[in-house]
């Protein structure tokens, strides 16, 4: 078993200001997105659409707003609506944490629609350009989660080579033991807990980096290197992220205030299913539209 390093969440102290790793990871993600975007500008079919470096900078501004506002509102509405209805001012306490990818995704989508309207472009043309830039940011965000030792995975077999002990999960581990006597006996978890006061868990943040970040980036980046029907790159992002998130959620610990929902699925899985369906529908529409246009030419 591997013990999580339990990093200091503060990366740098600048006088009274504490710069946290999680915030730095957001910065790294946005910088990586700019780099990927500028690489894409060199592709002939992208350059032919008239994209410029200034467009990337402007899209970044819209993207930051969409990510922060959408991510926060998504967390409030999807995960803890009851709490925030009773404590409305706590919505603004962003420093206490609480962001949702699915909310951030909706926020960025709306921001790109607004950007497209201002630039007189079709919004799918904008999202097709942006989609390959997103996974690097997702990977950076999940790395921030791992550094913070948060959003850990479900309890697993201590003999698994990937099993990791998370000091931040001690309280959850103690509460987990009496609820799962079969697994405690099967995996001899009582002995593990007596020795470490922790239980082995999946490092699900690393799984998400691998699937939602690295794998999705390469799939999108190489798919988008060739001209595709409008909407196809966006569709592949929806399908790819939805499948990656849905899969990883089987290893990720559900939010303790929600648990598992209908059919034994987590909130993250239920929010990912519409993305997959929408992505498939958009992909079919994109290629049918191109075939129709080619037949009419």
UniProtKB/Swiss-Prot annotation:
Transmembrane segments in this chain: where?
Answer: 17-37, 59-79, 97-117, 230-250, 257-277
**What's a Gene Ontology MF term here?**
phosphatidylglycerol-prolipoprotein diacylglyceryl transferase activity
Q: How does it sit in the membrane?
A: Multi-pass membrane protein
UniProt pathway annotation = Protein modification; lipoprotein biosynthesis (diacylglyceryl transfer)
The enzyme's E.C. designation: 2.5.1.145
Q: Does the keyword Cytoplasm apply?
A: no
Residues annotated as binding a 1,2-diacyl-sn-glycero-3-phospho-(1'-sn-glycerol) are 142
Keywords, alphabetical: Cell inner membrane, Cell membrane, Membrane, Transferase, Transmembrane, Transmembrane helix
Q: Where in the cell is it found?
A: Cell inner membrane
Broadest EC class?
transferase
Q: Which GO terms describe its cellular component?
A: plasma membrane
**Major location category of this protein:** membrane
One Pfam family cited in the UniProt record for this chain: LGT
Q: What Gene Ontology terms for biological process does this UniProt record contain?
A: lipoprotein biosynthetic process
Q: Extract the NCBIfam families matched here.
A: lgt
What PANTHER family does the record tag this protein with?
A: PHOSPHATIDYLGLYCEROL--PROLIPOPROTEIN DIACYLGLYCERYL TRANSFERASE, PROLIPOPROTEIN DIACYLGLYCERYL TRANSFERASE
Entry function: Catalyzes the transfer of the diacylglyceryl group from phosphatidylglycerol to the sulfhydryl group of the N-terminal cysteine of a prolipoprotein, the first step in the formation of mature lipoproteins.
Q: Describe the family membership recorded for this protein in Swiss-Prot or TrEMBL.
A: Belongs to the Lgt family.
Under which name does UniProt file this protein? Phosphatidylglycerol--prolipoprotein diacylglyceryl transferase
């Amino acid at each position: 078993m591997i013990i999580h390093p339990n990093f200091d969440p503060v990366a740098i102290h600048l006088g009274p200001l504490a710069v946290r790793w999680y915030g730095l990871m957001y910065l790294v993600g946005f910088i990586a997105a700019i780099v990927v975007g500028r690489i894409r500008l060199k592709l002939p079919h992208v350059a032919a659409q008239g994209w410029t470096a200034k467009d990337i900078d402007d899209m970044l501004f819209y993207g930051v707003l969409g990510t922060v506002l959408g991510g926060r509102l998504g967390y409030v509405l999807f995960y803890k609506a009851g709490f925030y209805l009773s404590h409305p001012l706590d919505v603004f306490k962003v420093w206490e944490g609480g962001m949702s990818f699915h909310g951030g995704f909706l926020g960025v989508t709306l921001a790109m629609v607004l950007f497209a309207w201002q630039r007189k472009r079709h919004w799918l043309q904008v999202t097709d350009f942006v989609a390959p830039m997103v996974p690097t940011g997702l990977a950076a965000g999940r790395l921030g989660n791992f550094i913070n030792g948060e959003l850990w995975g479900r309890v697993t077999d201590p003999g698994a080579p990937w099993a990791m002990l998370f000091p931040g999960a001690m309280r959850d581990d103690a509460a987990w033991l009496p609820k799962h006597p079969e697994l405690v006996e099967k995996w001899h978890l009582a002995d593990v807990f007596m020795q470490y006061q922790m239980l082995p868990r999946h490092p699900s943040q690393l799984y998400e980096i691998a699937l939602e970040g690295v794998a999705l980036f390469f799939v999108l980046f190489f798919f988008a290197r060739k001209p595709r029907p409008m909407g196809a790159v966006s569709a592949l992002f929806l399908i790819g992220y939805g499948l990656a998130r849905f899969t990883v959620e089987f290893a990720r610990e559900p939010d303790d205030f929600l648990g598992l929902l209908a059919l034994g699925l987590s909130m993250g899985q239920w929010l990912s299913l519409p993305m997959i369906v929408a992505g498939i529908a958009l992909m079919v529409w994109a290629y049918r539209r191109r075939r129709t246009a080619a037949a009419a030419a």
